[in-house]
Amino acid sequence: MAKRDYYEVLGVERGASEAELKKAYRRLAMKYHPDRNPDDKGAEEKFKEANEAYEVLSDAGKRSAYDQYGHAGVDPQMGGGGGAGFGGANFSDIFGDVFSDFFGGGRGGSRGGAQRGSDLRYTLELDLEEAVRGTTVTIRVPTLVGCKTCDGTGAKKGTSPVTCTTCGGIGQVRMQQGFFSVQQTCPRCHGSGKMITDPCGSCHGQGRVEESKTLSVKVPPGVDTGDRIRLSGEGEAGTHGGPAGDLYVVVNVREHAIFQRDGKHLYCEVPISFADAALGGELEVPTLDGRVKLKIPEGTQTGKLFRLRGKGVAPVRGGAAGDLMCRVAVETPVNLNKRQRELLDEFRKSLQGDDSHSPKASGWFEGVKRFFGDV
């Protein structure tokens, strides 16, 4: 019976990448593996066919020969350079994943079974003032801690874990599948080499219990949204004697009523009357350190930025403090009384025919005239 095209066997295009080949092969290996299809000759043949296809296509040299000459290029009986082994393919890596799926375990278990606890994340809400000046806060974090009843062993007090009978205490088992052998984490003890025959009643044999920890967090001055503070060893407790993970406190700075922050600089809007904008003046503006005087020159327009150097934020990693940028907003008066309206009307009449008082408006109107061909 003629062999099927190897690309067709794996269900990939001829230009498939190494990752695509591996993904396709792993899917077929999972589907047709003999352990999942006992006494199914058809599945066994498809499993062997997928093995053969992947063994050739995962090796650059064999794949090149196959692409050029077809099966004849890799079949030694037909003069090709291929062999019967699995030289180019890393089946151990792939089947480590496959077997872990069969048994529900992971490939990360090391000999002895000690595993580091998971890292935790906690979002810390801060006011702008707290973020700029630094602070110390107390937080409560739900986590997994070592069981005090059994000292983290998982075994009932007065008893001890026994040697795993499946792996003989080494935490690994060797599995033979056809042409190859794979060493895998023991599915019974999950790599610890030990079995708990009489589990602790407090943690039910897990060696860890849920608990909320109260921690004090020192927040350095200058932090900003997204900055992380690492508390080493304050994550979840490890298993089988493994170290605890870390806690990452992630800063989120709340919006401020007056200031907007951009890195080390602060921005604020300063409303002024149109009289102060025209005649100039002096007013007080807020900073994080208190009020300061800001001189407004005559003829100030809306949007004008005034820089107060050093009144921003000192960066958390050191360096000069940023600046406070005050953006002027000229306000139009409302709710005028009769006398005020008369004065403004008189003022408006005094401006007629003299464009020098409003250079931007004059330029704008001239542009409009040119646009419509009025000049």
Swiss-Prot record:
Alphabetical UniProt keywords: Chaperone, Cytoplasm, DNA replication, Metal-binding, Repeat, Stress response, Zinc, Zinc-finger
Annotated J domain residues: 5-70
Cofactor: how bound: Binds 2 Zn(2+) ions per monomer.
Sample GO molecular function, one term: unfolded protein binding
Compartments, record wording: Cytoplasm
Record GO biological process: chaperone cofactor-dependent protein refolding; DNA replication; protein refolding; response to heat
Positions bound to Zn(2+) 2: C164, C167, C186, C189
Sequence positions that bind Zn(2+) 1: C147, C150, C200, C203
Main location: cytoplasm
Zinc finger (CR-type) in chain: 134-212
GO cellular component: cytoplasm
Requisite cofactors: Zn(2+)
CDD domains, A to Z: DnaJ (cd06257), DnaJ_C (cd10747), DnaJ_zf (cd10719)
InterPro entries recorded: DnaJ, DnaJ_C, DnaJ_domain, DnaJ_domain_CS, HSP40/DnaJ_pept-bd, HSP_DnaJ_Cys-rich_dom, HSP_DnaJ_Cys-rich_dom_sf, J_dom_sf
Chain positions of CXXCXGXG motif repeats: 147-154, 164-171, 186-193, 200-207
PANTHER family named among the record's database cross-references: CHAPERONE PROTEIN DNAJ, DNAJ HOMOLOG 1, MITOCHONDRIAL-RELATED
Summary of the function given for this chain in its UniProt record: Participates actively in the response to hyperosmotic and heat shock by preventing the aggregation of stress-denatured proteins and by disaggregating proteins, also in an autonomous, DnaK-independent fashion. Unfolded proteins bind initially to DnaJ; upon interaction with the DnaJ-bound protein, DnaK hydrolyzes its bound ATP, resulting in the formation of a stable complex. GrpE releases ADP from DnaK; ATP binding to DnaK triggers the release of the substrate protein, thus completing the reaction cycle.
Family as reported in the entry's similarity comment: Belongs to the DnaJ family.
Subunit organization: Homodimer.
Free-text comment on this protein's domains from its UniProt entry: The J domain is necessary and sufficient to stimulate DnaK ATPase activity. Zinc center 1 plays an important role in the autonomous, DnaK-independent chaperone activity of DnaJ. Zinc center 2 is essential for interaction with DnaK and for DnaJ activity.
Protein name from the UniProt record: Chaperone protein DnaJ
Lineage: Bacteria, Pseudomonadati, Pseudomonadota, Gammaproteobacteria, Pseudomonadales
Gene: dnaJ
